[in-house]
A protein has these predicted regions:
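Mobile, glycine-rich extracellular loop/lid and propeptide segments
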Residues: 1-82
Length: 82
């Protein structure tokens, strides 16, 4: 997951879990939470994310966020607006 600081690419983080289904979501939400707490880092601007790139057969995926990703909570669409 790319990390932006002041609108410029500053680095990246990766997550390796027990599967591939939510690794990108955890990195995405972790960076969003860090940005909210620190005010200095952010996810890529929406206009520059990979899911804006069309390739034959579809679009590239930036992050996959299931509608209801967490157990024992009613939280849904947790990536919307980030």
């Amino acid at each position: 997951m790319p990390i932006f600081k002041g609108g410029a690419l500053a680095g990246a983080i990766g997550i390796s879990g027990d599967g591939i289904d939510q690794d990108d979501m955890i990195a995405f939400l972790g960076l969003a939470n860090a940005g909210a707490a620190l005010g200095t880092v952010a996810n890529a601007p929406a206009a520059t994310r990979a899911d804006n790139i069309n390739v034959p057969g579809g679009r590239l995926r930036y992050v996959n966020c299931p509608v209801s990703p967490f157990l024992d909570t009613n939280a849904s669409n947790v990536c919307n607006g980030l």
